[in-house]
Structure formats: structure tokens, C-alpha cells
């Protein structure tokens, strides 16, 4: 009930406070309360209005959490906005919360011993109560036709979408009743009660659903919501569903037939009750609706100047009736899809003729940017059907003829409700015909589970999936494989398959014998490349942009696999993805990640021949998943071929979110690379070239199945599509090969970012970076990160010319010239190396500066010699190998010099990133350093370079110096004045090469612990962070830093200064620009090919002499005066102060 009854009294008190409360759904509510009310009383006062129990509320004002025992007046919140967030449930409550009796599909998954632990809150407004949400289906046709991919917002439980529809309608009816009560009791409402009623957030999903439904007349009544808001509010409907019966007994029922979950579906009588209640509400609303029409009819001309009270009353009526109409319309839409098939045998129940995605707008999250802060437990849907599912009622009933029926959540529910312990073949036939192969991706945050189905129809997986009949309940080959890992054993621990991929049978029987199958792969027809590329591009691209990410956990799921031999066929051990580049979710992680893999214990499964002839499309698709999602085995060719990565998620584990991008990094994909330690200059090539696997050929993929198995053109098309999805919000054109330089220049609006010689890009490394960015597109970079060296091969002429001109200064590429140029170049990095290691503890006796400089000289000497001498077709592969080798050895060397302390090495890298990123968005820098730390840990855990390989580079204090070349080049002076060499060197390029190591060794352990430690560290840094939901922390921190930090502004123009008040102009002008004579001379000498007679240092000292500076000042003044006299475009009227600045008298 609204707290308005007490607030009207509070308004009469002389010392009342008007407090604005803003919730996570961006709604602001106004409360007028007594000034002496304490915070705890205020929480209880607003609990009903905000739908959050008082004990779970956290009120934040000016970065501080309001304490319960203090008074509101003490915080001076009168007329101010207080932010309200909901406290995350304690970790100890997670398992019990998962067993809440709210009626979701896993209500009893914890064994059912604690059904009432949540207390009354579970049936009230506990948004953290357990709920399942169906994310939809994705069908891949076998005829090569295009596949349309949509991102939709959808709320539908795996258990029963009709039930959710009724529950949502009941919630909305209660909301309408609340609104009617407020209109009928006018005196007990607040002055500004125009905000949505207490329960309105529960209908956000329906509101979103209406937005894209052009055929529904009530569309106009559903105001569009922001994706963030709608996602957050979508989680509530199923959490407040006391009507849903516990699904504990369900598992026993589903075994006989897939439709045995019918008891969870609502009966027609329940639908009738809801409709009757709607009729009563309409009768109650009628008088207010008439008054509403009267007010609106006269609204254009009514004069409220002297009738403030009347205006308030009319405005209040308009708001409340409008909100009631919105809820009423949404209720009708939710109920309009419910049908009862009278042809079915009794007892009949309701089903849904069209899924919620029917109403939603495709690509809802297209505008989402990275990093995304999300609310734990949000719902995101990905659906895409090669053929539209028939809306007929029979489709939901899993009729044998409905090949697309699986796209409807109800029929999907039949899949997930079947139990692992149901060996009888009886239940198999119905789903066998209605479900093609399924790839399921599920997400669990706290308790809600998000799932996605990808249905891959091959020529033999239609109703004719008879070959799989021997597998009993498994249905068609592909479908059965996904069935085995679905929610088997509700009573014990309902598990969800994160990803299940049916495997070609001949590839699975012998894991080590996988390589022979590569021939079939290479011989597979490429007719469906376009379709596959389009499908995977949209799928991966949209997954990378979604806030909802894959959750992984591990129960003891071996029995599930054992009960389904064909399922075991698809169960290769899944490498635990490295949780690095999930910017969208790093802030939302609320607990540790328990990840494990289940290997099919039934060896007979792989040998089963049910799906005898996998199509070429299937083979290509499975290998493509291997490339993108990472091979499933530690190196066996079989898993690499089929890539059936399966991970089981358990609801009881603490909350964790990991990005779909982690699958791109699993064992072969390319993760965002950690930058090399600041010293290494050879990184210029590595900046973009570092591929994951050993650069020579396609060894990045285990089992001998290199990237060549898939045509580079096909891989390129997939990458192009993924990047188009990711960069579409930044204006990137589809299919565009825009260079990185052009892309950044277009976003920044500056034309000189990558021009050689421009500010911030001086020196050799800056020019090299410019060359790479001007010639490489985003697609080229991703190709390099995945081990394809073709972009480097294409760049060979430009690189060779560049090194000849900028590196050798036009001299002959002899060994002595190369060594001398390398020495000069690397020596210029000494100050950056010293600065980078100044704050870390180095091993006693080790000369870290010399160690790095001499190591870099040797590595870069090899790279430069290769670029200048190699002319054959192995240029790209060898260059890639040199960069990878240099990176790994550099990391191993510095780790050894730092005593094996990974934290010290990470501090060196992150310190350099922060120094290079001054003025950059702090949240982006924070994300970058966190991501680099995670990736660095993965790289170091699978380091292919041993200590013995790098000991020869270690230099001790007192060791004799290395023999120096005869004469350093003049480039050294320019290098010392520019921070760019280090910037290039410290760029996050080569980290992705860890994939090579990961493919050689066992799958990496999950990095959840590391992420949690970092989250904890960031929370400790700010006292308020512990009381704020994780997704709010980066937002608040960014606001704090942006208020503290003022970006440097460019110098003001003369015209601007002339219009400024004199007093302010004096304070703004300062001493004028700094004279950079030494820089100008170095640049001119380099352009002319001249070199100083002495050393660059002595030249710099000479140029800094006062008399030289004064002469330079006079010469500069004279040049400007001459320019002002001769330039026809100069106008003294436009620049009135120019004569004073550059007059003859200083």
C-alpha cells in the first residue's frame, strides 16, 4: 500500500521533509515525511511503494549509506535525491534461496530441505527469488538459406510460459487495484503520486513486448523502455508467483512423456477467473475513465491559474488513469496468446500460441556500449528462426510435424523437464520429431537462469530421426545429446547445459584419432559458407554485446551423461574459459565461479552411429565453433573437430557472470592480449600481429587442425560479421574494411592522430604504429589474433620500406647497420624501463635495466633482420613467430627477475598503462588494467617458455657491459624526447598468444577467484562500495573521478581571448607556449639525414642555453611578423591583440 496516508499528514507539519527517492529503474518517487523520522522508519515507510523490503534497502546520499539509527534531518536530504538500491542476499542464503517455493523450474533443486527459508519475502517482493527465463531458440536450416538473428527481451520460464502469462496478468491486476484504490480514496494519496504504482516494474517485460507489435492496437499504450530498465524489471514477475506450484514432484512425472509437465500449466478455469476479475476492474474504472475523457477534452483551454488544487487533482487523475490503461492493455496482451486445444485429451490446459519474442524489437541491445553495467539476474533473449514457427496451437504441443516447435518456450520446457533417470524409450518419440539439434547456452546470476537454444537442422534430423530410436528418451541424435544434460534430477540438483554440441559419430569414438577426420572437414562442401558465416556472425556478435552472460558451475553430473549414451557423445571436456574480457560483467560479478566439465562416462556413446552422415555444414559449423569457442579437449583432434564444449551450471553456487567472449578465449580463441612489460620495444609488430598459436601455420588449433582447415575467406566473413555487430553502434559500416586509423579518427574527430610526426606519435615506434593502424582493419587484427598471418604477409612491402627508411635511415641492411640501429633505438628506451620498474621489488643482484635493454636489442634485432631480408612466402608466419617468441620470453624473463611474483609483473604492466592513459576515461582504464591482469595470469599459468630458456638474458650488477656498436644513430635524440616508443611497446598486443600454450596444456582453471579478489580490492578502496550492488560501483566511481579530474583544454584562440573579461584573461594567459627548440632541431636533423658531431645529449644541452633560446624567440617573433604582413587572410580587426603579442618591442 502506498505510504500516502501518512504523507498527507506530514505535509501539515511545520517541520516536514520532501525526499526524492530514485530507484534502479530510473524512476523517482516523492515522499513527504516528518523531519524527525529516522532512516529505518523511512525505509519501512517506502517499502510498499518501491517493492523492496525495508531490511533489503540501501539508501545512498552523496556517496554515503544512510544509517538506520540516524534521522533524515541529520543528512540534510530535504528536497534532495536519495538513491535506493537493493542489498544483494548474503552468500550463505544462495543455496536455500534456490530452493524457494515460488514455483520456478528449480524450486526444489537444492534437495527441497529448505523450502521456507526465504520466509514471506519470497512470495512478496523478493526480486532475488528463484526464477527461470527462457532465452529462445536459434534454428540453422540445412538448405543454406539465410538465418536472421534477433536479440529480444523475453520473460518466459522453462517450466510454463502460460503460467507466467497468467501470473503477470495477476500482478498487473493487483497494480490496477492499487491504482483504483488510490483514485477512490483521494485524500490518502501523495501530491506527486504520478509515478508508477508499487508493482509496475513487474510488467516491464510486457511493456517491452508491446513495443514491436505493430498488429496490437494497444501498442501506443506501452511506452518504450530503455533496455537496461526493462531488463532489470523483467526479473520480477516470476519471483512473485505464489501461484506457481512447486516443481519438486515434476521430475517424477516428466519421465513417462515430455508433456507430463502439464500440471505446471494453468487450467482454463484459472484463465476464466482472471478474465472475470478484469471485467470487475473495468467496471470500477469506468467512472474514472469518463472523468478522464472530460478532463482531456477540456485540457486544451481550461484555465488553472486560480485553481491550483483543481489542477493537481486533474493531473493526478490523468496520471493514474493512464497508468491503469497501460496495465490493463498489457494484461489483455498477456492473456490474448493463451489458448486451449479442445482436440487434446482431458485434462486440458492452456498453452501459448506465440512466444514473447513475437512482440519484441530485434537487436534491442544493438546500442549497448562496452563496458555495460547490468543488474544481476536480468533477462535477455536471443531468438532467430530460419523459418517462422507456426503460431498454431499444435506447435506448442510438440506435434511431430512441427520442426520449429522448439522455438516456442513451452515445447522447450518439455525438453528441460525430462529427467535423466528416464531410460524408457517411451518419452523419446514426441520430442524426437519436434526438436532438431539443440545448442543451449544458459546463464545464472544469483538464481535466475537464462538459456538460449540453437537448433541446427541437418538433413537427417527431421521427424526421420529414427536412427536414434535405440537411444530411448534421447530423440533425434542432436536433440538427445542436449537432452542428457538438461535439468536431470530436479530433486538432486537441476543442472543446465551451458553449451552442448552434437558431434559427428565417426569423430567421437576415438578422441586421439580425431585428426584423420580433418580430411572430411577439408573436403566438406562450402555451399553454406554464407549462411554459416551470417549465423555465427550474428550469434557471436550479439552475445558479445549482451549484458547477460554465460554462467558455469559444476555439480556431479556424470549420471546424467551415463543415462544418455548419445548425450555422452557430445560431451568432451570443456575448457574453462578465461574470464578476461567481460567488461560488461566484471562489475556485475557477485561471487566466485565454480566451473567444471563433465565428460561423458559412457564410452559406448561415442561409438553409437545414430547420426550417420553429418552434413558438410555440420562439419564446418562444428569446427567453426571449435575456432570461436575453443576446442573441447586438451589437445586431442577429436574435440577440436567437434568442439562439443559442455558445461553444467548449478543454481546453488554464488553469483557469477562471465562474458560470452570468454569462449572466444577458451583454448584457441584470441583473448584481449595483456601488454608486454613496458620495456619490450619489439612489440611494434606484436601490437597487432601476435597470434595465439605458434605463428607457423595453423598450429593454434590442437590436433593438427589449424586455421587452414576453414578457408580464410570463410573465417574472414565470420569475423567481419561479428565486428559489424559489435561496432554497429559506433557507426561502422557493414562489411567495411575501414582501417583502424580511419576508425579512430572518425570517432575522435581529429585528423592528425596517426600522422607521423604529429604530437603523441613521434619516434620510430609512433611511426610504426601509424603504419600498422593505417593498413590494418579490425578484421585483420582479429585474424592475426587467431593465428592467421595473411594480413602481415600482405603488409610485407610496406614494412620493408618503412624499416629501410625509418630504421636504417636509408642505409644498406647489413648486419652491422641493423645492430647499430637497434642499439640506438633500444637505448632510447632506458628511461622508460627505469621508470616502469622503479616501484617494484627486483631480485637481489639483478640489473633489471640492462637485462631488459639487452634482451630487447637481441629480439628486435632478429625482427628487423627478418623484415629487411626475408622475401619469400613465409614472411608473415615467421614474423608472427618471432613476435610471439619475444613476448613470451619477455614475460618469462621479467617474471624471473621479479622473483616469480606475478602481482609485481602485473603492477609493472598496469602502471605503464595508467601512465599512457592519462586523460582517458577512468572506467575504460580500470577495465583495461583488470582485463590485462586476468589475461596475464592465464598466460603465465601456461607459459611455454621455461626458466632455462631465459637465464642467458639475465644480467647481474657488476657484469661486464655488452660490446657497443661503433656509433649510435641520430635517431636516439628523437627517441629520448618521445614517450611513444614505450607506448607502442606496452600496447596490449601479444597477450593472445597464450592460446598456443593453452592448447598444449590442460584447460585453464577458471579465473573467478582472481576476479573476486580484484572486485574485493576495489570495494575496499571505497567504504561505500560494499553496500552498493556491483553494477553501480563503476558508475559511481566514474562520476567521482570525473568530478575530481578536469581534462586539459587546448590553448584558447586570440579571438576567444579578446571577448573574455580582462580580469579573467590575465589569469588565463600564463607564460605562453613552451619553446621546444631541441625537438625542432632533432626533427629537422632527422629529416635532413644529419647527425650531431657530438652526442645528442650535448646537443640538447647546447640548445637549452639562455642565449640560444632568446635568439630562437626573436627569430620566431620575426617570422610571425613577416607572416602577418604577407598573409592576405590576416585581418587586424579580427585579431586585435596580434600587434601587441608580436610587436617589435617585446
Swiss-Prot record:
GO terms for cellular component: BAT3 complex; cytoplasm; cytosol; extracellular exosome; membrane; nucleus. Residues 109-122 have a biased composition (Gly residues). SUPFAM superfamilies: Formin homology 2 domain (FH2 domain), Ubiquitin-like. Residues 87-128, 186-268, 381-436, 457-525, 555-618, 666-711, 961-1146 are annotated as: Disordered. Residues 239-257, 422-433, 502-515, 603-614, 670-694 have a biased composition (Pro residues). Residues 236-650 are annotated as: 4 X 29 AA approximate repeats. PROSITE patterns: UBIQUITIN_1, UBIQUITIN_2. Residues 1024-1054 are annotated as: Required for interaction with GET4. GO terms for molecular function: Hsp70 protein binding; misfolded protein binding; molecular adaptor activity; molecular function activator activity; polyubiquitin modification-dependent protein binding; proteasome binding; protein carrier chaperone; receptor ligand activity. The modification Phosphoserine is found at residues 96, 978, 987, 1095, 1131. Residues 96-108, 394-413, 555-573, 583-601, 1021-1034, 1080-1090 have a biased composition (Low complexity). Residues 208-217 have a biased composition (Polar residues). The record marks 1015-1016 as: Cleavage. Keywords: Acetylation, Apoptosis, Chaperone, Chromatin regulator, Cytoplasm, Differentiation, Immunity, Nucleus, Phosphoprotein, Repeat, Secreted, Spermatogenesis, Transport. InterPro entries: BAG6 (IPR021925), Bag6_BAGS (IPR048926), Ubiquitin-like_dom (IPR000626), Ubiquitin-like_domsf (IPR029071), Ubiquitin_CS (IPR019954). This is Large proline-rich protein BAG6. It comes from Rattus norvegicus. The gene is Bag6.
Amino acid at each position: 500500500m502506498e505510504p500516502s496516508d501518512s504523507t498527507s499528514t506530514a505535509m501539515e507539519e511545520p517541520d516536514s521533509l520532501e525526499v526524492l527517492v530514485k530507484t534502479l529503474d530510473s524512476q523517482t518517487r516523492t515522499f513527504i515525511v516528518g523531519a524527525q523520522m529516522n532512516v529505518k522508519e523511512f525505509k519501512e515507510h517506502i517499502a510498499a511503494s518501491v517493492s523492496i523490503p525495508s531490511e533489503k534497502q540501501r539508501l545512498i546520499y552523496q556517496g554515503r549509506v544512510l544509517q538506520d539509527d540516524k534521522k533524515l534531518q541529520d543528512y540534510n536530504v530535504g528536497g534532495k535525491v536519495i538513491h535506493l538500491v537493493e542489498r544483494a542476499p548474503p552468500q550463505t542464503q544462495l543455496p536455500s534461496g534456490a530452493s524457494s517455493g515460488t514455483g520456478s523450474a528449480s524450486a526444489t533443486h537444492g534437495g527441497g530441505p529448505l523450502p521456507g527459508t526465504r520466509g514471506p519475502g519470497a512470495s512478496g517482493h523478493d526480486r532475488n527469488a528463484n526464477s527461470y527465463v527462457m532465452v529462445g531458440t536459434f534454428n540453422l536450416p540445412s538448405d543454406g538459406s539465410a538465418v536472421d538473428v534477433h536479440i529480444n527481451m523475453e520473460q518466459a520460464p522453462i517450466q510454463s510460459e502460460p503460467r507466467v502469462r497468467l501470473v503477470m496478468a495477476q500482478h498487473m491486476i493487483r497494480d490496477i487495484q492499487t491504482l483504483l484504490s488510490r483514485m477512490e480514496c483521494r485524500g490518502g494519496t501523495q501530491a506527486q503520486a504520478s509515478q508508477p504504482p508499487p508493482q509496475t516494474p513487474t510488467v516491464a517485460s510486457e511493456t517491452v513486448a508491446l513495443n514491436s507489435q505493430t498488429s496490437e492496437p494497444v501498442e501506443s499504450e506501452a511506452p518504450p523502455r530503455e533496455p537496461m530498465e526493462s531488463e532489470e524489471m523483467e526479473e520480477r514477475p516470476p519471483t512473485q508467483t505464489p501461484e506457481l506450484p512447486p516443481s519438486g514432484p515434476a521430475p517424477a512425472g516428466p519421465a513417462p512423456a515430455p508433456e507430463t509437465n502439464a500440471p505446471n500449466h494453468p487450467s482454463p478455469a484459472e484463465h476464466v477467473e482472471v478474465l472475470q476479475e478484469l471485467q470487475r476492474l473495468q467496471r470500477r474504472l469506468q467512472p474514472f475513465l469518463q472523468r478522464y475523457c472530460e478532463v482531456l477534452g477540456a485540457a486544451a483551454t481550461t484555465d488553472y491559474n486560480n485553481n491550483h488544487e483543481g489542477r493537481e487533482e486533474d493531473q493526478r487523475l490523468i496520471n493514474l488513469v493512464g497508468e491503469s490503461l497501460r496495465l490493463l492493455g498489457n494484461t489483455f496482451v498477456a492473456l490474448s496468446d493463451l489458448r486451449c486445444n479442445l482436440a487434446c485429451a482431458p485434462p486440458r490446459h492452456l498453452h501459448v500460441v506465440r512466444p514473447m519474442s513475437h512482440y519484441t524489437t530485434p537487436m534491442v541491445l544493438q546500442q549497448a556500449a562496452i563496458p555495460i553495467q547490468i543488474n544481476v539476474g536480468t533477462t535477455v533473449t536471443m531468438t532467430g528462426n530460419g523459418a517462422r514457427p507456426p503460431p498454431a496451437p499444435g506447435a506448442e504441443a510438440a506435434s511431430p510435424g512441427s520442426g520449429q516447435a522448439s522455438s516456442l518456450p513451452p515445447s522447450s520446457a518439455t525438453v528441460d523437464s525430462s529427467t535423466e533417470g528416464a531410460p524408457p524409450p517411451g518419452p523419446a518419440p514426441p520430442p524426437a520429431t519436434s526438436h532438431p539439434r539443440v545448442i543451449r547456452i544458459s546463464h545464472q546470476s544469483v538464481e535466475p537462469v537464462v538459456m538460449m537454444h540453437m537448433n541446427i537442422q541437418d538433413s537427417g534430423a527431421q521427424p526421420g530421426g529414427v536412427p536414434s530410436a535405440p537411444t530411448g528418451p534421447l530423440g533425434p541424435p542432436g536433440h538427445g545429446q542436449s537432452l542428457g544434460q538438461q535439468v536431470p534430477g530436479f530433486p538432486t540438483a537441476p543442472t543446465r547445459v551451458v553449451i552442448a554440441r552434437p558431434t559427428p559419430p565417426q569423430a567421437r569414438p576415438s578422441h586421439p584419432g580425431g585428426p584423420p577426420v580433418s580430411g572430411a572437414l577439408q573436403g566438406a562442401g562450402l555451399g553454406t559458407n554464407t549462411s554459416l558465416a551470417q549465423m555465427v556472425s550474428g550469434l557471436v556478435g550479439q552475445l558479445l554485446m549482451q549484458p547477460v552472460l554465460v554462467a558455469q558451475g559444476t555439480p556431479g553430473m556424470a549420471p546424467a551423461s551415463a543415462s544418455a549414451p548419445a548425450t555422452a557423445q557430445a560431451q568432451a571436456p570443456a575448457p574453462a574459459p578465461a574470464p578476461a574480457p567481460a567488461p560488461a560483467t566484471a562489475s556485475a560479478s557477485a561471487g566466485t565461479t565454480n566451473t567444471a566439465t563433465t565428460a561423458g562416462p559412457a564410452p559406448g556413446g561415442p561409438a553409437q552411429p545414430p547420426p550417420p552422415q553429418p552434413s558438410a555444414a555440420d562439419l564446418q559449423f562444428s569446427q567453426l565453433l571449435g575456432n570461436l569457442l575453443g576446442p573441447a579437449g586438451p589437445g586431442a583432434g577429436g574435440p577440436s573437430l567437434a568442439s562439443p564444449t559442455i558445461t553444467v551450471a548449478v543454481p546453488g553456487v554464488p553469483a557469477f557472470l562471465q562474458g560470452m567472449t570468454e569462449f572466444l578465449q577458451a583454448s584457441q580463441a584470441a583473448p584481449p592480449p595483456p601488454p608486454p612489460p613496458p620495456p619490450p620495444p619489439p612489440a611494434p609488430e606484436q601490437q597487432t600481429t601476435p597470434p595465439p598459436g605458434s605463428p607457423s601455420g595453423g598450429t593454434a588449433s590442437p590436433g593438427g587442425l589449424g586455421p587452414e582447415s576453414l578457408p580464410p575467406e570463410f573465417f574472414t566473413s565470420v569475423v567481419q560479421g561479428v565486428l559489424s555487430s559489435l561496432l554497429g553502434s559506433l557507426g561502422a559500416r557493414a562489411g567495411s574494411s575501414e582501417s583502424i586509423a580511419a576508425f579512430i579518427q572518425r570517432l575522435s574527430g581529429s585528423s592528425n592522430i596517426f600522422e607521423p610526426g604529429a604530437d603523441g606519435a613521434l619516434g620510430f615506434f609512433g611511426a610504426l604504429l601509424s603504419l600498422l593502424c593505417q593498413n590494418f582493419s579490425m578484421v585483420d587484427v582479429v585474424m592475426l589474433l587467431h593465428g592467421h598471418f595473411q594480413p602481415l604477409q600482405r603488409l610485407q612491402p610496406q614494412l620493408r620500406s618503412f624499416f629501410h627508411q625509418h630504421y636504417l635511415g636509408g642505409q644498406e641492411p647489413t648486419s652491422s647497420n641493423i645492430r647499430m640501429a637497434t642499439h640506438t633505438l633500444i637505448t632510447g628506451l632506458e628511461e622508460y624501463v627505469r621508470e616502469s620498474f622503479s616501484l617494484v621489488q627486483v631480485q637481489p643482484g639483478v640489473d633489471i635495466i640492462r637485462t631488459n635493454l639487452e634482451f630487447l636489442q637481441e629480439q628486435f634485432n632478429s625482427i628487423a633482420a627478418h623484415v629487411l631480408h626475408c622475401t619469400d612466402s613465409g614472411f608473415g608466419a615467421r614474423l608472427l613467430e618471432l613476435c610471439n617468441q619475444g613476448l613470451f620470453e619477455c614475460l618469462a624473463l621479467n617474471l624471473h627477475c621479479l622473483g616469480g611474483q606475478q602481482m609485481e609483473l602485473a603492477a609493472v604492466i598496469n602502471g605503464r598503462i595508467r601512465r599512457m592513459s592519462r586523460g582517458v576515461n577512468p572506467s575504460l582504464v580500470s577495465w583495461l588494467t583488470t582485463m590485462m591482469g586476468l589475461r596475464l595470469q592465464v598466460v603465465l599459468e601456461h607459459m611455454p617458455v621455461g626458466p632455462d630458456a631465459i637465464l642467458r638474458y639475465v644480467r647481474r650488477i657488476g657484469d661486464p657491459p655488452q660490446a657497443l656498436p661503433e656509433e649510435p644513430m641520430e635517431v636516439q635524440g628523437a627517441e629520448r624526447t618521445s614517450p611513444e616508443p614505450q607506448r607502442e611497446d606496452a600496447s596490449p598486443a601479444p597477450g593472445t598468444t597464450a592460446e598456443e600454450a593453452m592448447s598444449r596444456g590442460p584447460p585453464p582453471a577458471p579465473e573467478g577467484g582472481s576476479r573476486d579478489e580484484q572486485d574485493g580490492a576495489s570495494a575496499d578502496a571505497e567504504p561505500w562500495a560494499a553496500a552498493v550492488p556491483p553494477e553501480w560501483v563503476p558508475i559511481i566511481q566514474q562520476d567521482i573521478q570525473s568530478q575530481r579530474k578536469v581534462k586539459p583544454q587546448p590553448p584558447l584562440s586570440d579571438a576567444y581571448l579578446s571577448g573574455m573579461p580582462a580580469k579573467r584573461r590575465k589569469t588565463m594567459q600564463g607564460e605562453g607556449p613552451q619553446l621546444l627548440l631541441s625537438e625542432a632541431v632533432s626533427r629537422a636533423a632527422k629529416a635532413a639525414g644529419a647527425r650531431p658531431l657530438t652526442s645528442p645529449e650535448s646537443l640538447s644541452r647546447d640548445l637549452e642555453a639562455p642565449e640560444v633560446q632568446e635568439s630562437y624567440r626573436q627569430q620566431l617573433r620575426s617570422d610571425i611578423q613577416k607572416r602577418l604582413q604577407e598573409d592576405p587572410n590576416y585581418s587586424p580587426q579580427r585579431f586585435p591583440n596580434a600587434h601587441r603579442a608580436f610587436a617589435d618591442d617585446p
